[in-house]
From Swiss-Prot:
The chain crosses the membrane at residues 7-27, 418-438, 439-459, 465-485, 521-541, 546-566. Belongs to the SecD/SecF family. SecD subfamily. One of its GO terms (molecular function) is protein-transporting ATPase activity. It comes from the Bacteria. It comes from Borreliella burgdorferi (strain ATCC 35210 / DSM 4680 / CIP 102532 / B31). This is Protein translocase subunit SecD. Its main location: membrane. Keywords: Cell inner membrane, Cell membrane, Membrane, Protein transport, Translocation, Transmembrane, Transmembrane helix, Transport. InterPro entries: Acrflvin-R (IPR001036), MMPL_dom (IPR004869), SecD (IPR005791), SecD/SecF_arch_bac (IPR022813), SecD_1st (IPR048631), SecD_SecF_C_bact (IPR055344), SecDF_P1_head (IPR054384). Part of the Sec protein translocase complex. Interacts with the SecYEG preprotein conducting channel. SecDF uses the proton motive force (PMF) to complete protein translocation after the ATP-dependent function of SecA. The gene is secD. GO terms for biological process: intracellular protein transmembrane transport; protein targeting; protein transport by the Sec complex. It is found in: Cell inner membrane. It is a multi-pass membrane protein.
Amino acid sequence: MKKGSKLILILLVTFFACLLIFPTLKWYFLMSVEDKKISSYSQEALRDYSKKKALNDLVKLKELYNKDPNSSIPASLSYLIPIAKNNYRSSMKIPPNIFTAKTLREGFLTDSDMGEVSLEIYRYYENIKKGKSRIIHLGLDLSGGMSVTISLDYSSVEKKLGRSLTFAEREDAIYRIMQILKDRVBRFGLTEPKIVREAGGNKIFLDIPGEKDESRVSTLLSGKGNLTFYVVDDESTSLLHRKILEAGSLFSIPEIQASMNLPDSKQIFPWYVKDSYGVDDESSVRYYVVDASPENSFDGAHIKDAGVSNDPRTGRDTVAFSLDVDGSEKFFKFTQKNVGKSLAVVMEGKIKSVAGIGYAITGGNVSIQGDSFDKKEAQDLALVFKTAAFPVDIKIDDLRIIGPTLGARTIDLGIKASALALCLVFLFICVYYGLSGVVAGFSLVIYNVFLILAILSAFNFTLTLTSIAGLILTMGMAVDINIVIYERIKEEIREGRRFENAFEAGFKKAFLSIMDANITTFIAVLFLTLLGTGVIQGFAWSLSVGIVASLFSSLIFSRFILEFIISVRKSKFISISWSSKYAKSN
């Protein structure tokens, strides 16, 4: 490869590596602890925080205006300026070039303006949360938290079906359980977890950083879910709506329910409209009375699968789901008895959808067509059907709590050990190989580590003590690459070749040996990556990425630097040993 091509390749790789590693650097070194904490809130908690902060900041702006209308805008309120500019333009006004308390205050005159501020705050933290999918995370041994190993038990389902589950059915069950766990973790407001499955196995590993309450996690994992179909009591629902109107804005559902003298079998559930934050809007809710008696309800645990389809006759999106054999028969009797009535889909005490029963449904294939379904709403409802209940039984095989003190201690020791190892490697190669060693040390200890961390960031890698060990081992292997190259160059010099020729021949003849050794190691590591679990997989991942980065750093980057140094030196020579024999040109 020509020097120009090498330079272009190095610049491209470095540019993309900078893009990949920036989110990690931003998260750990540029972002405040407060922002990190807030970004881990659940959607509901983040919405409430955004509204509260928007209100407080607008109050601060008003106080600033009352104190001195011409005062400058503090940094904490500077995020309001772009919103104010949009408000000026929406009012057909020209925004000022420089904002003061007076001009900024004039950009927020209506209640809807506060909503815009709240949304801007919400989007800011949502973007931080999304950015976490592109950073290197600290494992539980470094950050502390809880580690849970979950195994799947297919026996009860297979006994019920009278046959063994197919490979596709098992894979679907694992996928659905992982989706359920993600959904439940978000509802419980826990820190974003790491949920991975055992390669080729029936285990799921759930790591929750910072969590120490065993009872909360046990509650999260307990139960199969409670998606239920209820028949709507239209007469009682109409009465409920009238009483809500009579009571006005300060109505109380428990008081209204008591005044209606409803029997125990009749229950009231809310149906929330999603707000602009994508969460339930407390101010936009409609209540329904349902008949919760066993004969007028259907257990959603019978749902096998769900998806979104399009009705060719109406062009509307529909949510279709299929039932197991037992559920098909029960659902037929259930719908046959209630033709012409409304059906409410209830999960976690909230109505997810209401649809009419047009006819008795046979065959276990059901479709729901809402009057105002859009694609997103249909997909959300399908996900509710798929993830409401664990499709198979689960059990906790192992639950471990790692304290933050241990995490802090292991971080400190890990950083010290890594730094010491890198310094010793750098010192050795510099002393033994002279200026060539300095170039190799820079390319391996600095550029190589930079590439490895950039690649691991792209894969949302979780850094553990074992993966750190893999990185240190990678440094040693990278040094081996340069040792092979330099020793080969020295052999060529001993055979009487000029340095320029020995340099080219050394790299060329060492190439095959280097590739053979690293490809062999990479194949072994690849199997550990695919088949290993937990700490073994983390070690294998860091080692495999390190091999690729080390080859590029040694064969492309360090060679280009050496060639550049040689080209600008009059002697056309560079030291490759502490020995005077190789310290001057032939």
